[in-house]
Amino acid sequence: MDSATTFSWAEADFCISATVDGAQQRLVELATIVYDRVCRTNFLAPGFCLVNLGAELSSQAFRRFMLALERQMKHLHRERLDRDLILMSAARFDQQVTTKPHRDGGPDECFLMLGYEPSPIRADLLMSDYSRCAHDMGLTPGEYLEKHNPMFAAGLRILKDYTTRVTCFCNLSFQILLINNSIAEFSEVAPRWQGVLHTATIVNPEESFRRVVNSLMVASVPIGTEEPISSKEQDEFVHTNLVRRSGYDKPSLEDDA
């Protein structure tokens, strides 16, 4: 923890540099570090981390590495908790919309893997530890969001002292941002993942450029649960050129094929 701001994490707590070199041992080591920082059941870890892979990489190799990292985290999860990890969604989109602190829906225990490709579009990212804030206020994470919605100014103010800026984020590199997206209640008897909210402020949006995000949602489930994203769909995620651009906020945009 950063002593200057009580609940803000230092860069060394969440910033990691790595390479995609095919070495299994390095992948195992990276997965262990990432798992420990993201898949927390208390407040001794950030609940998020950023892995910078540099700029000398292809998009397909990047996406393939994301899936390899997720599979290695799956092995860890089985060994430690006798539970499984499954992919709930896999998508690629052009994200150039500023957001407020939010979670992306999904099961009570899940995390996001957001794979950012190099782009001229700059962004500032913030992580807000709403689970810890809720715990300090005697609330569950769900109750906290109902009573102090951070989409509004009053709720946003409460989170100020629980917010960390992702200072190592670089728009010129391939990066994987892993975010504990959970909303589970804290328990020492039956530990469950404790989530954080994320915020993106787009500095210089420009529709003629792209800010490609490769997004995976990963859930913690009992072993034997069927995975919604098939092997074929995972392969398509790696090899597709499709980038979703249209949405509720920009319905007129056409997707890149």
Segments and roles (model prediction):
Residues L126-A134, K232-V238:
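Short intrinsically disordered coil segments
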Residues M1-E79, F237-A257:
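N-terminal auxiliary "cap/dimerization" subdomain that precedes the catalytic jelly-roll/cupin core
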Residues C49-N52, L112-L114, D124-L125, I176-I179:
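A structural signal for short, well-ordered beta-strand segments and their strand-loop junctions
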Residues H75-S128, H148-P150, L156-R165, T199-I202, ...:
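Conserved double-stranded beta-helix
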Residues A55-S58, P118-I121, S182-E185:
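Short, solvent-exposed loop/turn segments at secondary-structure junctions
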Residues A154-A257:
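Catalytic core of Fe(II)/2-oxoglutarate
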Residues R40-F43, K100-P107, V166-N171, E206-R210:
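A general structural signal for short secondary-structure junctions and capping/turn motifs
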Residues S128-H135, T140-G142, M151:
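C-terminal folded domains that constitute the principal catalytic or ligand-binding module
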